[in-house]
């Protein structure tokens, strides 16, 4: 199956008073039709900046995409005209943002905010857009959908606001849905409801999903493949079951080791990754994880490893074979 989206060698920088921040450094990934790709990592690793760069949503200044490609349907999203990218954003590639509390306009009704993209991208009349908006709210599980179109965001709970955001993202039947930590501000019960809702809609509508999160528990039950980011780089990528069963990068091992397990003794201390994430004012020449890594060897401090395929579909950027206990050649 051909790739629906291919991102290659993406680099994004931010110019600040303190210096140049290298936020995304040569990130590459692909997405197939109907596939769910999870992008995981600590806060500040470049997850959100990667997809915002791809959709040209990085504020400029201070941000700038300095290299790379994002090929969708034969077009490079980074090079097409402003008008062309506007026709794709929201219609073909849609996005759910992190915080449902602030992502909706507080002075416009929910109906107005749902109807505008339908009239803009789908060419609907106001009556048609109103009917479609009510259908969308019903589809995401909001009762009394037509009546609630007249309500304002503050009249909805956090979970219901996130459902509205999902309805808005799905309004134009996108091929790709990008979910940027959509459950971060919600309690665990509502998180589970939102994840199940997205899974159901994915299966019904056949769309591809990029799900960005720091929560490996959510990704386990949602994604087909996982890319792990650290310091602006993808450092491991694998099918989800393979990654959880056989993590090969010390950072991935640390992330998985920090998860609480229901089958273990409740008195066990959770493991943690010592140290702090890298400061990105300088693009690292060595492995960015080396200062925090208990497996590090001499090459780790001299050269940044590239992603290499170690088994079908499983790529890792590490100088050490952590399972074999030896240095990679």
Question: What is the predicted role of each segment?
Answer:
Residues 171-175:
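A short, proline-enriched helix->beta-strand linker immediately N-terminal to the Walker B motif
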Residues 151-156, 160:
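Conserved ABC ATPase signature
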């Amino acid at each position: 199956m051909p790739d629906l989206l291919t991102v290659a060698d993406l680099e994004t920088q931010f110019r600040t008073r303190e210096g140049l921040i290298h936020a995304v450094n040569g990130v590459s990934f692909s997405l197939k039709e109907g596939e769910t790709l999870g992008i995981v990592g600590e806060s500040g690793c470049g997850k959100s900046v990667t997809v915002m760069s791809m959709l040209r949503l990085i504020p400029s200044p201070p941000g700038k995409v300095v290299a790379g490609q994002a090929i969708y349907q034969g077009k490079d999203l980074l090079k097409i005209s402003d008008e062309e990218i506007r026709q794709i954003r929201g219609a073909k590639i849609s996005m759910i943002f992190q915080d449902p509390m602030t992502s909706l306009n507080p002075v416009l009704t929910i109906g107005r905010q749902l109807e505008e993209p339908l009239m803009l991208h789908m060419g609907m009349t106001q009556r048609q857009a109103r009917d479609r908006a009510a259908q969308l709210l019903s589809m995401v599980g909001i009762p009394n959908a037509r009546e609630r179109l007249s309500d304002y965001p503050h009249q909805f709970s956090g979970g219901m606001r996130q459902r509205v955001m999902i309805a808005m993202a799905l309004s134009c039947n996108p091929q790709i849905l990008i979910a940027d930590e959509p459950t971060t501000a919600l309690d665990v019960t509502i998180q589970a409801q939102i994840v199940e809702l997205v899974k159901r809609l994915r299966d019904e509508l056949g769309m591809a999903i990029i799900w960005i999160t720091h929560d490996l528990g959510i990704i386990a039950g949602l994604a087909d493949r996982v890319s792990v980011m650290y310091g602006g780089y993808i450092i491991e990528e694998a099918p989800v079951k393979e990654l959880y069963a056989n993590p090969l990068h010390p950072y991935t091992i640390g992330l998985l080791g920090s998860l609480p397990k229901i089958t273990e003794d409740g008195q066990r201390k959770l493991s943690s990754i010592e140290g702090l994430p890298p400061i990105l004012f300088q693009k690292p020449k060595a492995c960015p994880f080396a200062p925090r890594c208990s497996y590090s060897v001499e090459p780790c401090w001299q050269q940044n490893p590239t992603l290499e395929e170690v088994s079908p579909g499983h790529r890792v950027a590490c100088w050490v074979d952590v399972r074999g206990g030896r240095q990679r050649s």
